[in-house]
Amino acid sequence: SGDTSSQAKGMWFGPRL
């Protein structure tokens, strides 16, 4: 529950940071 959320966060925060 929350796999897509975790993936989206990493993709959005990954390149951002």
Curated annotation (Swiss-Prot):
Broad class of where this protein is predominantly found: secreted
Keyword annotations from UniProtKB, A to Z: Amidation, Neuropeptide, Secreted
Compartments reported by the entry: Secreted
Tissue: Expressed in abdominal perisympathetic organs and abdominal ganglia.
PROSITE patterns: PYROKININ
Biological process according to GO: neuropeptide signaling pathway
Modified residues (Leucine amide): L17
GO CC annotation terms, alphabetical: extracellular region
GO terms for MF: neuropeptide hormone activity
Family per similarity comment: Belongs to the pyrokinin family.
Function: Myoactive.
Protein name per UniProt: Pyrokinin-5
Species of origin: Aptera fusca (Cape Mountain cockroach)
